[in-house]
Regions:
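N-terminal accessory scaffold of Fe(II)-dependent oxygenases
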Residues: 1-239, 249-302
Length: 302
């Protein structure tokens, strides 16, 4: 059996403890309380506000965490108003992996339905001010990046470093590790989530399939016996810190709103840069990179 360990808790009101924690790598996950009291989002981010102010934001309810699965295209407010409806009953239309409309209902399971996918920070830049400043700015270099440079980095790594996940009760994020040894953080604004994490040395895949902490299949994953699983229920206003290369899984115990951020600091900056240059090296032509630079930094040069 896996060995369950309660994730450590810290308070942001203990700066020496926080400093020591981040200086350690961080080497283990941690749930931090009292970290976002100064954010306007701590009071303003809820389903009622998002449904009211951003009702017409168009996106899609993804059929899986990974890209390339399509889902149900609809408005954010419509999704929130229909949390408890089967996916096919939510007003909207089906889209394929390329986000083109589908004529027929795709094969899917309600158990695999993930999160509402849209671009909140691009559509509503004021949201950034509502989650600023980061509680521990010395340990998060990303918050100091100009928006155009951040946009370029995200284009190169093909991943957003900051996202808002709105999902229904029971939505699962399968075990995965984040990119380029970034540090991850999850802040819960609505509902609660069960989180399970495995360190890099305590996780073993099986033919590329992720281990499911909710269905302990030791026949397929014999290596997972006696491995350490760090667990906790992440509650409203709490921040989970995910160390680099740690595998993590979440299960929404309620309808949920979560802020996800990935960042680097002096401990993992070199690792991120190596990953960045690896991504650049995989580009088919130099013109591809030049186009990204022109798109995101061109205005800054004039």
């Amino acid at each position: 059996m896996t060995i369950e360990i309660d994730i450590r808790r810290l308070s942001a009101r203990e700066p020496d403890e926080i400093q020591a924690y981040f200086e350690s790598g961080p080497s283990e996950p941690c749930v931090i309380s009292d970290a976002i009291e100064h954010w306007p989002a701590a009071r303003a981010w809820n389903f009622d506000r998002f449904a009211r102010d951003f009702f017409d934001d168009f996106g899609f309810i993804s059929l899986a965490m990974e890209d390339g699965h399509g889902g149900r295209a609809t408005k954010l407010g419509t999704f929130i108003a229909n949390f408890d409806q089967p996916l096919h009953a939510i007003p909207g239309f089906w889209v394929g992996p390329d986000l083109a409309p589908l004529r027929e209902t795709p094969d899917y399971s309600e158990d695999d339905v993930w999160s509402f996918v849209w671009r909140p920070f691009k559509m509503h830049p004021q949201l950034l001010a509502e989650i600023s400043p980061f509680p521990f700015p010395d340990h998060n270099y990303v918050t100091a990046l100009p928006p155009d440079l951040l946009g370029l980095l995200q284009a190169i790594v093909r991943t957003k470093l900051r996202s808002i996940y709105i999902s229904r009760k029971g939505s699962i994020t399968p075990l995965h590790a984040d990119f380029h040894r970034t540090i991850g953080s999850l802040v819960q604004f609505e509902g609660s989530k069960q989180v399970v994490l495995f360190g890099p040395e305590d996780y073993a895949e099986c033919d590329g399939d992720p281990f499911d902490p909710a269905r302990l299949d030791y026949t397929r994953f014999p290596e997972m016996r006696e491995r350490k699983a760090f667990t906790r229920i992440l509650k409203r206003s709490e921040m989970l810190i995910i160390p680099p290369d740690w595998w993590h899984y979440t299960n929404a115990l309620d309808h949920s709103m979560t802020l996800s951020q990935n960042f680097f600091n002096r401990n993992n900056f070199a690792d991120f840069v190596r990953g960045l240059f690896s991504d650049i090296g995989k580009m088919e032509t130099q013109e591809q990179l030049a186009g990204m630079i022109a798109k995101h930094l061109g205005k800054a040069r004039h």
